[in-house]
Amino acid sequence: MNNNINHIKITQVKSAIGRKYDQRLTLVGLGLNKINKTVILKNTNSIKGMVEKVKHLLKIENM
């Protein structure tokens, strides 16, 4: 396993209700659909961009 690849732990802390449709789709793309659901993803540029778009709904931790 390559130890040079960083991962981030993302937890949804706020609801997507009342948010724009593209923000809801971004959460689904990250694998999040319920409050307090956590996913661990590779820290790539595409993931960073998605996280930046909905960062107000998430808690982000580096691993």
From Swiss-Prot:
Gene3D superfamilies: Ribosomal protein L30, ferredoxin-like fold domain (3.30.1390.20)
Keywords, in A-Z order: Ribonucleoprotein, Ribosomal protein
InterPro entries assigned: Ribo_uL30_ferredoxin-like_sf, Ribosomal_uL30_bac-type, Ribosomal_uL30_ferredoxin-like
Pfam families, per the entry: Ribosomal_L30 (PF00327)
One BP term from GO: translation
Quaternary structure annotation from Swiss-Prot or TrEMBL: Part of the 50S ribosomal subunit.
UniProt similarity note: Belongs to the universal ribosomal protein uL30 family.
NCBIfam families in the cross-refs: rpmD_bact
Annotated protein name in UniProt: Large ribosomal subunit protein uL30
